[in-house]
């Protein structure tokens, strides 16, 4: 194994959720779940979609899709999923279509659900010998190493926490991950890229013309692939799939600049593609349909950004901004692409504020606040003690006031992490 590949593979394994479960089968979804969320799960039913004569997308096996291009002289695999075992199942489905050899693999960006499953499709020996190329942006390997080396352990914890990875797949717990089925966490089989580029790359692979373009958005090293012969746009996560884009991800990330993301979406619109293949969710066909999805997505991101900046400059703090900035009905109702299955308006607003102004909101009390446990102890005493706090929390829960119930219980938990009632 190449030295950097070995390091990167270890680091990638640190950024995966600590546990994962299979997606909940449709027949096990009961009426207790939100009907819209139940309907959303159906977007990720396992299926290999044929988009054009030579382009296929495998949806529903794992969090990330895998796309296959059948070129005259061999196959080009776009992204590899997070799970080598699930990706082997996908490759078995592809083998029902063609027996051509794999000639190239493309990593659209450095996130684990797009690069970890590569050895389901190729071996290190094939890459080392030059039989197979691995194509990516020139910064991908540095991003893999930097993320894992610096914050890999905590990203793993936060990723598992934000995805609810320890919860069982039931109608009361987990159903889907918003952009796909629940993640399948496995050790990474990452192999380093052999061909990289900076801004754009027009090339011929396995007898087929391909155009690559760097379009920073959901990731700083995001690239898309365009097939001019049949006007197919493989949009990576610039168009993130059936959800409001997550301008901020709860697991933690560097600032995702909404202005840059909007510019990248406009670059995709300029292709006037007949087909679009995102790497999460189903493909979109028809030039007008592709244009509508891209335009509405860019309008949604632009609106959130512009209104946040507008009210930020009027002095509103993040807690005030999240109550002020709302998508208008024509955007909020654009199902599924602007619904809050993965990204949310409130999370995005806080990210934008922090990206421009940092953590300080202007209240001097926040410069040196009381430690959380000290604050909880004083507030619980002020409210009459633990029993009264928990009674109030229980009453709020029974009334459906779940946020207040959680906040009250949080004070008791800060005093005693093993408090079973809290």
For the regions a protein language model found, what residue spans apply to each?
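Bacterial N-terminal signal peptides that target proteins for export
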Residues: 1-8
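Bacterial N-terminal signal peptides
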Residues: 8-19
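Accessory terminal helices/loops
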Residues: 11, 23-38, 152-153, 165-172, ...
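Metallo-beta-lactamase
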Residues: 24-25, 50, 75, 82-84, 142-214, 260-272, ...
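Active-site metal-binding motif and surrounding structural segment of the metallo-beta-lactamase
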Residues: 43, 48-51, 72-74, 85-134
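Conserved beta-strand hairpin/beta-sheet module of binuclear metal-dependent hydrolase folds
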Residues: 45-98, 224-237
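Active-site neighborhood of phospho(di)ester-bond hydrolases with catalytic His/Asp-centered motifs
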Residues: 78-80, 101-113, 135-138, 233-236, ...
């Amino acid at each position: 194994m190449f030295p950097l590949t070995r390091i990167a593979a270890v680091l990638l394994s640190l950024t995966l959720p600590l546990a994962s479960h299979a997606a909940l089968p449709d027949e096990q979804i009961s009426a207790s779940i939100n009907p819209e969320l139940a309907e959303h799960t159906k977007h990720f039913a396992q299926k290999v979609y044929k988009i054009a004569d030579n382009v296929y997308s495998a949806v529903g096996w794992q969090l990330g899709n895998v796309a296959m291009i059948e070129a005259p002289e061999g196959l080009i695999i776009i992204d590899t999923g997070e799970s080598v075992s699930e990706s082997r199942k996908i490759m078995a489905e592809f083998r029902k279509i063609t027996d051509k050899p794999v000639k190239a693999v493309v990593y659209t960006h450095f996130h684990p659900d797009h690069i970890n499953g590569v050895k389901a499709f190729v071996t290190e020996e094939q890459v080392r010998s030059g039989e197979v190329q691995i194509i990516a942006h020139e910064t991908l390997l540095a991003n893999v190493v930097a993320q894992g080396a610096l914050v890999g352990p905590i990203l793993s914890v936060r990723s598992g926490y934000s995805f609810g990875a320890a919860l069982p797949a039931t109608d009361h717990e987990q159903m889907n991950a918003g952009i796909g089925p629940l993640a399948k966490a496995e050790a990474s089989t990452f192999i380093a890229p052999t061909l990289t580029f900076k801004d754009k790359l027009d090339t011929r692979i396995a007898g087929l013309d391909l155009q690559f373009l760097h379009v920073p958005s959901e990731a700083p090293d995001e690239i898309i692939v365009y097939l001019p012969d049949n006007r197919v746009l493989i949009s990576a996560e610039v168009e993130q799939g059936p959800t409001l884009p997550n301008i901020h991800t709860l697991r933690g990330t560097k600032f995702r600049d909404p202005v840059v993301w909007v510019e990248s979406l406009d670059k995709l619109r300029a292709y006037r593609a007949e087909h679009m293949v995102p790497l999460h969710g189903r493909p979109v066909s028809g030039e007008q349909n592709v244009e509508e999805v891209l335009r509405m997505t860019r309008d949604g991101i632009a609106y959130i950004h512009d209104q946040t900046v507008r009210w930020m400059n009027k002095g509103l703090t993040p807690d005030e901004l999240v109550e002020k900035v709302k998508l208008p009905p024509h955007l909020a109702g654009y199902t599924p692409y602007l619904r809050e299955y993965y990204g949310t308006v409130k999370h995005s607003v806080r990210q934008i504020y922090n990206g421009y102004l940092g953590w300080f909101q202007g209240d001097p009390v926040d410069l040196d606040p009381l430690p959380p446990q000290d604050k909880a102890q004083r507030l619980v005493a002020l409210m009459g003690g633990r029993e009264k706090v928990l009674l109030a929390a229980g009453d709020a829960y029974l009334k459906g006031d779940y946020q207040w119930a959680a906040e009250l219980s949080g004070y008791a938990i800060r005093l005693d992490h093993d408090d079973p009632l809290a």
